[in-house]
Amino acid sequence: MSNHPLLQCINLCKRYQEGQLHTDVLRNVSFAIEPGELMAIVGSSGSGKSTLLHLLGGLDSPTSGEVIYQGRSLNQLSSTAKAELRNRELGFIYQFHHLLPDFTALENVAMPLLIGGSKPAEAQEKAHEMLAAVGLEKRSKHRPSELSGGERQRVAIARSLVNNPSLVLADEPTGNLDQRNADSIFNLLGELNVRQGTAFLVVTHDLQLAKRMSRQLEMRDGQLQHHLTLVGAE
């Protein structure tokens, strides 16, 4: 096993400029994620959590600073290389599942594999395995409209893991769910972490759910606090 972090960000800054006005969304954010780690970043709306996740996933570029994933600087990668990295090595989960409405659960989960060049039969077999891993093997032929909110988010989790990523970035994955389903989703993330060794970085406003992760950080006004407080928690 490598002694290097799975992902590291160094002095990340993100500034949005409009004419003479500017907004500093992130200010000198630095931290690392270890292989197999369960980490939560807690913060209120507008604190910079989602912007940070976009930078870590190569969906946006920092104004300054650097993101290093498994020894590779995202700043040095082309757009094509970043897209390939996202497809093959990173998983993403969002507050809203973003499932394709005209496709079944199985087809939605298989989609990243097909985009990556897998044969249809192989993609379907792997998608079946992942749906079974999240407890939805009997719902594989259902479309999103035929699934509950919790089930749709489980499909989204299966889709994020189908390429066996080393790291999954989750942006408020339980924000659109009731407490029972939110608890179930967090339990599932923990189970998948143990079973598959996948690292998860979850950004959330829910302190109680975040405390169930192995490490918690707090985002305040674009800066990362390497401790967690009860201030502003819901």
Curated annotation (Swiss-Prot):
Subcellular location as annotated: Cell inner membrane
GO biological process, one term: lipoprotein localization to outer membrane
Domain ABC transporter: 7-233
Any GO molecular function: transmembrane transporter activity
Pfam families to which the protein is assigned, alphabetical: ABC_tran
Main subcellular location: membrane
List of residues binding ATP: 43-50
Tree of life domain: Bacteria
Record keyword Protein biosynthesis present: no
InterPro entries per the UniProt record, alphabetical: AAA+_ATPase, ABC_transporter-like_ATP-bd, ABC_transporter-like_CS, ABC_transpr_LolD-like, LolD_lipo_ATP-bd, MacB-like_ATP-bd, P-loop_NTPase
Function statement: Part of the ABC transporter complex LolCDE involved in the translocation of mature outer membrane-directed lipoproteins, from the inner membrane to the periplasmic chaperone, LolA. Responsible for the formation of the LolA-lipoprotein complex in an ATP-dependent manner.
Family classification: Belongs to the ABC transporter superfamily. Lipoprotein translocase (TC 3.A.1.125) family.
Protein name according to UniProt: Lipoprotein-releasing system ATP-binding protein LolD
Gene symbol of the encoding locus: lolD
